[in-house]
Amino acid sequence: MKLATPRWWYLREGAPSPITRALLTPLSWIWAAQTARRIARTTPRGADCAVICVGNFTVGGVGKTPIVRELLLTLTKRGRRAHGLARGYGGKLKGPVRVEPSRHTVAEVGDEPLMLAQDFPMWVSRDRVLGARKAAASGAEVVVMDDGHQNPDLRKTLSLVVVDGETREDEWPFGDGRVFPAGPMREPLNVSLGRTDAVIVLLPADLPEADPRLLALFGDTPVLIARLEPAAPPPKGRQVGFAGIGKPWKVERALKAAGCHLVDFAPYPDHGQYDEATLNFLWERAQTYSAGLVTTEKDWVRLPQAWRDRVTPWPVRARFEDEGALGALLESVGL
């Protein structure tokens, strides 16, 4: 059974009680030590192409997939043969396999690769090195890897880390800074930052600017600001929303900020599958309010085919505020 991301992970005060902190802290020490040991003992292997890693410091969703999409689009516009690469979380295929939307399903390749494959060459591979090499053999000049900052197997040309820029209502992207499971961090921030070429702070569309206190944490590491913006207006009329992403409450907030008449919202675990019972519950809920159903593109591709006409997917896109700075960063590694 998939578990939802604890909201307290992303609150400044962290765990809701001292007892919870005390119970989880020893497990955090073990997790951090294992991560450090794996990275220290692994010699990265290369592929016959450049590799841009889009990772994160934390467990849970920060908006990597929209950034991966925007980077693939930017590289393609710059004349580069760019392919995407993902582990295929939630899919059963080990790969390496090129994702074909007309043939593959979410159960085989995962939701994010299937979504990205609608627009770009996309590969799924549990072994990132084999996946990157397969992409290179198929003509890729550069591979954009979704996640993998803590995976030392594949040598990176550029390591980018996406940070959720939401800091309102006592939210903080790193919580109280504790490592999983006592907090959201995959490893201590200073350790992870040491392997980072640039940080991408992803802001909600309605947040005026990045929090200076957050930016100060990154020291001399270059920071790019991007915004997660609607690619289309939300559906008109009353709507019941639902989402199964790392931080589903952000979808609810974004829909309301975009002007959606949201009468109810249901959060679900990240990458979870929607069975008939769940979908019937949502449909009946919408009928109670005389409302439609709206969800994210990522959730929509996980719906059974028979349900897709009943649910409106709401697309969002990442936009870099300073495209020149992004271009300079890519040029610095020959891209």
From Swiss-Prot:
Chain positions recorded as ATP binding sites: 58-65
Assigned EC number: 2.7.1.130
InterPro entries reported in the protein's UniProt record: LpxK, P-loop_NTPase
Gene Ontology, cellular component aspect: plasma membrane
Pfam family, one: LpxK
Reactions performed catalytically: a lipid A disaccharide + ATP = a lipid IVA + ADP + H(+)
Record key words, sorted: ATP-binding, Kinase, Lipid A biosynthesis, Lipid biosynthesis, Lipid metabolism, Nucleotide-binding, Transferase
GO function terms (MF aspect): ATP binding; tetraacyldisaccharide 4'-kinase activity
Pathway(s) of this molecule: Glycolipid biosynthesis; lipid IV(A) biosynthesis; lipid IV(A) from (3R)-3-hydroxytetradecanoyl-[acyl-carrier-protein] and UDP-N-acetyl-alpha-D-glucosamine: step 6/6
Enzyme's top EC category: transferase
Transmembrane segments: none
Superkingdom as given in the UniProt entry: Bacteria
One GO BP annotation of this record: lipid A biosynthetic process
Family: Belongs to the LpxK family.
Function: Transfers the gamma-phosphate of ATP to the 4'-position of a tetraacyldisaccharide 1-phosphate intermediate (termed DS-1-P) to form tetraacyldisaccharide 1,4'-bis-phosphate (lipid IVA).
Protein name (Swiss-Prot/TrEMBL): Tetraacyldisaccharide 4'-kinase
